[in-house]
């Protein structure tokens, strides 16, 4: 039966496409689907995802609650009055427990409301008036802190729990950094630690950026959801809003950098330094007087409970939790963990982490690395089995999976690590015994072998980039006897990376520390990640070298994200991928979900909330001087065509009001275009195309090495547009302005896409990717050898085109941000006329595409655009 509008508890009157999305989402969650949702930015997608998923979750919980009550009976053979009593008693106990929490949170909320009128003391009461001192000062850490503990590889399974060791030894460097932030444990007794009777279904909400998770928290504040207890089982003394609403319990978890309130730690120069200092202050051999005074301990249970109730009473963002921690005098980073058990919604900022997922959570939001990497989920004890996963802004999901499981190491990093290990080895030579001495020697031999091969590549006349074989890296003396898996276990267990980095930092001249402290994790973490890549199936990934500015880097690239994501798909109840521009969707179906039965797969692409007359899209094949726009690799440097492009853009800027954003395929190509535009035109008395465009609209340009920040460039652009002259902003596909930046209203009346931003097909990485797709398709195809080869070539070509068109669609999505917005989209290249290319555009763009013809002159397009904007000015 189709759900009605009010069933989703949307805070506003939803548009029809929002209703369609929420209905489809509800159905997919109920049926356990794997689905891809495309809903343009500006259509209220995030709020629709929240309302649709929370409505389903509350319905599901009510059903589960009723089932639990019905199952609480003694025996079906008992008298009916006894069965009824058992059901009522079970209902009363479960309801009272939940109501008690609601009443406590309501009391706290009212207290906060009363305090809001008072000026808060920014310092707040301190729990203990003392601060940790720098580790290098007298009374801090000694050299003994950095010595390795004895290690016995024959008894490795007893030195650390096997499951924890297996999980953490397989993490990528970026995820190891996340996990290191959570190694310290809170010693406080867990308040309200009653175990749930069963593992309630949760929603894992995953997004990429700080701003997206901040937006999620903001949208959540608007939502009011009904009780998760069946209405006929609720206590009769609930009235008014209390009867209708059960608050959504939410907590935002952040990194130490976001939440640390110890000024001696939070003032350090980067996140890595903050994390390391915090962990160092918790080591057992640190003098208690020098430990962090805000770290929760057993005697701080009252403050932890107070923090929990305040955090849950209203939806708070990361800044609110920081202020709350200062006011109570307790570390909000660790205290926020106590909130998780009773929360329904748990937000994590990008580069944040969780250390467990209690049964009572209903919604868990987290950054990509901790969801997409199996070893991270296991190390955090966070199973997704039977739960729902919603990944928002998922247009780059396949790339994200590949990047998370890819590792890069440079020759300079290898040389630095060798130097640090040598210094460390000399200092602790007499204390390195047995297996420690053996493994440290193995690390040095392996790093030396890899460094020697990279050095030979750097000094050779070989191409700037190319593939590398594992055997080439392991060619050093004695390296073939090394067991990479045992060595990687040793690196993680012994904490050699932290010991070496800590000692080097400890002995560095204090005057050099601020300038020389690296903003990244210790290089041995990168080495560890690289060692793990050597154990991956060779068919799924490749090794590449790349020479850059006197250095050379070695990269393991995961080519196929399918198997890395498969466990999530098979374990989860439902998987939802959502984004503003998910087209083209064939990659998800053919590659990421190729093993999923068709009956479980679904795709949805919704239109925009704007009326059809508010968007016009054109392909532009020829310029105002008749040049055919062909920006293929072999033709794109034609000066005649580039000059005509400039004249055409000048003409378009004359008819498109306010702000126009033009996207080019790359920084290098934009630079070449600008150089040609600034040349004097023949017979024009020194006039340049650049000046010609500037007469219509002032020009601003993005560059790889901008002297201003992106925010400053956007601020200048907005001010120029507001001045009344409008502006032309030259940008790059995949650059700083192509994703996450909104060009709404006057800032984006026109969006021009110049050329198609195909990746460099000649690069070693892309040749390997396409070769892998072709080989995989050939193996899976049926029929004759000729037909299998054709299918393989078609699959490789489709994969290559999809990568390009996803980038194009992201740029197009920068315009049109709300219902009353309007804009023109112009696709400048003859290849946009191809049906296969147009088929990869989002549905909401295709339906606004003006019928095109290769023979149409540019003047006809200009007239069409002039008519479109004239209709908006009346």
From Swiss-Prot:
Enzyme class label: isomerase
MF terms in GO: ATP binding; ATP hydrolysis activity; DNA binding; DNA helicase activity; iron-sulfur cluster binding; metal ion binding
Keyword field contains Phosphoprotein: no
Keyword rRNA-binding: no
A Pfam family per the record: Helicase_C_2
UniProt short sequence motif DEAH box, positions renumbered to this chain: 392-395
GO terms for cellular component: chromatin; nucleus
Residues annotated to bind [4Fe-4S] cluster: 260, 278, 292, 331
Cross-referenced SUPFAM superfamilies: P-loop containing nucleoside triphosphate hydrolases (SSF52540)
Cofactors named for this entry: [4Fe-4S] cluster
Residues in Helicase ATP-binding domain copies: 4-444
Entry-linked PROSITE patterns: DEAH_ATP_HELICASE, HELICASE_ATP_BIND_2
Reaction(s) catalysed (UniProt annotation): Couples ATP hydrolysis with the unwinding of duplex DNA at the replication fork by translocating in the 5'-3' direction. This creates two antiparallel DNA single strands (ssDNA). The leading ssDNA polymer is the template for DNA polymerase III holoenzyme which synthesizes a continuous strand; ATP + H2O = ADP + phosphate + H(+)
Entry binding sites for ATP: 39-46
Location in or out of the cell: Nucleus
Residue spans of biased composition, Basic and acidic residues class: 92-115, 156-167
Protein name per UniProt: ATP-dependent DNA helicase chl1
């Amino acid at each position: 039966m189709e759900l009605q509008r009010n069933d989703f508890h949307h805070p506003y009157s939803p548009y029809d496409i929002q209703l369609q999305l929420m209905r489809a989402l509800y159905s997919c969650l109920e049926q356990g689907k794997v689905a891809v949702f495309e809903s343009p930015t500006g259509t209220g997608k995030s709020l629709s995802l929240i309302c649709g998923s929370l409505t389903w979750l509350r319905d599901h919980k009510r059903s589960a609650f009723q089932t639990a009550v019905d199952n609480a009976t003694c025996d079906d053979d008992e008298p009916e009055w006894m069965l009824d009593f058992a059901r009522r008693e079970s209902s009363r106990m479960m309801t009272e427990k939940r109501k008690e929490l609601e009443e406590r949170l309501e009391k706290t909320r009212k207290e906060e409301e009363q305090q809001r009128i008072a000026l808060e003391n920014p310092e707040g009461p301190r729990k203990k008036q003392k601060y940790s001192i720098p580790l290098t000062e007298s009374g801090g850490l000694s050299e003994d802190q950095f010595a390795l503990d004895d290690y016995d590889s024959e008894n490795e399974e007893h030195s650390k729990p096997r499951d924890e060791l297996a999980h953490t030894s397989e993490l990528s460097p970026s995820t190891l950094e996340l996990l290191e932030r959570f190694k310290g444990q809170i010693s406080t007794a867990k308040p309200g630690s009653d175990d749930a009777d069963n593992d309630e279904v949760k929603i894992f909400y995953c997004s990429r950026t700080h701003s997206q998770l901040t937006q999620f928290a903001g949208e959540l504040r608007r939502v009011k959801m009904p009780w998760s207890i069946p209405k006929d089982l609720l206590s009769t003394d609930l009235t008014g809003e209390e009867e209708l609403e059960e608050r959504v319990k939410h907590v935002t978890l952040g990194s130490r950098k976001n939440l640390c309130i110890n000024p001696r730690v939070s003032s350090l120069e980067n996140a890595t330094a903050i994390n390391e200092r915090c962990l160092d202050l918790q080591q057992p051999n640190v003098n208690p007087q020098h430990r962090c005074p805000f770290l929760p301990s057993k005697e701080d249970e009252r403050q932890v409970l107070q923090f929990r109730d305040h955090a849950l009473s209203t939806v708070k963002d990361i800044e609110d939790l920081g202020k709350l921690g200062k006011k109570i005098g307790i570390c909000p980073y660790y205290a926020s963990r106590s909130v998780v058990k009773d929360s329904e919604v748990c937000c994590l900022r990008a580069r944040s982490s969780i250390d467990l997922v209690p049964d009572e959570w209903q919604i868990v939001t987290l950054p990509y690395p901790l969801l997409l990497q199996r070893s991270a989920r296991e190390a955090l004890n966070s199973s997704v089995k039977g739960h729902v996963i919603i990944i928002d802004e998922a247009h780059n999901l396949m790339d994200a999976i590949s990047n998370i499981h890819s590792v890069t190491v440079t020759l300079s990093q290898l040389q630095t690590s060798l130097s640090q290990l040598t210094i460390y080895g000399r200092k602790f030579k007499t204390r390195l015994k047995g297996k420690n001495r053996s493994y440290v020697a193995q690390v040095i031999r392996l790093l030396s072998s890899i460094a020697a091969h990279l050095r030979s590549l750097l000094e050779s006349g070989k191409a700037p980039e190319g593939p590398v074989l594992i055997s080439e890296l392991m060619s050093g003396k004695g390296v073939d006897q090394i067991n990479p898996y045992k060595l990687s276990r040793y690196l993680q267990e012994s904490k050699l990376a932290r010991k070496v980095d800590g000692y080097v930092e400890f002995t560095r001249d204090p005057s050099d520390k601020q300038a020389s402290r690296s903003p990244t994790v210790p290089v041995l973490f990168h080495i560890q990640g690289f060692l793990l890549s050597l154990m991956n199936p060779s068919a799924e990934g490749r090794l590449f070298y790349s020479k850059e500015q006197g250095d050379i880097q070695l990269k393991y690239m995961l080519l196929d994200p399918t198997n890395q994501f498969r466990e999530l798909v098979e374990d989860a109840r439902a998987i939802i991928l959502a984004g503003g521009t998910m087209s083209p969707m064939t990659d998800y179906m053919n590659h990421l979900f190729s093993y999923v039965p068709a009956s479980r797969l679904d795709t949805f692409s919704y239109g925009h909330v704007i009326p059809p007359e508010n968007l016009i899209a054109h392909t532009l094949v020829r310029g105002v001087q008749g040049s055919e726009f062909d920006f293929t690799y072999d033709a794109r440097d034609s000066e005649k065509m580039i000059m005509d492009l400039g004249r055409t853009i000048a003409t378009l800027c004359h008819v498109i009001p306010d702000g126009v954003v033009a996207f080019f395929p790359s920084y290098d190509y934009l630079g070449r275009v600008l150089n040609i535009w600034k040349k004097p035109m023949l017979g024009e008395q020194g006039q340049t195309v650049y000046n010609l465009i500037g007469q219509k609209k002032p020009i601003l340009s993005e560059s790889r090495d901008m002297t201003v920040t992106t925010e400053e460039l956007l601020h200048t652009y907005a001010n120029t547009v507001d001045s009344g002259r409008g502006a032309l902003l030259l940008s790059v596909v995949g650059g700083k302005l192509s994703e996450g930046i909104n060009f709404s209203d006057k800032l984006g009346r026109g969006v021009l896409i110049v050329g198609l931003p195909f990746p460099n097909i000649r690069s070693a990485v892309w040749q390997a990717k396409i070769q892998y797709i072709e080989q995989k398709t050939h193996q899976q195809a049926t029929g004759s050898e000729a037909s299998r080869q054709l299918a393989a070539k078609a699959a490789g070509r489709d994969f290559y085109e999809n990568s390009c068109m996803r980038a194009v669609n992201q740029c197009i999505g920068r315009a049109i941000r709300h219902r009353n917005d309007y804009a023109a989209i112009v696709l400048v290249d003859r290849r946009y006329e191809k049906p296969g290319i147009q088929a990869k555009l989002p549905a909401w763009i295709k339906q606004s595409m003006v019928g095109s013809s290769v023979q149409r002159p540019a003047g006809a397009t200009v007239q069409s655009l002039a008519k479109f904007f004239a209709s908006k000015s009346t």
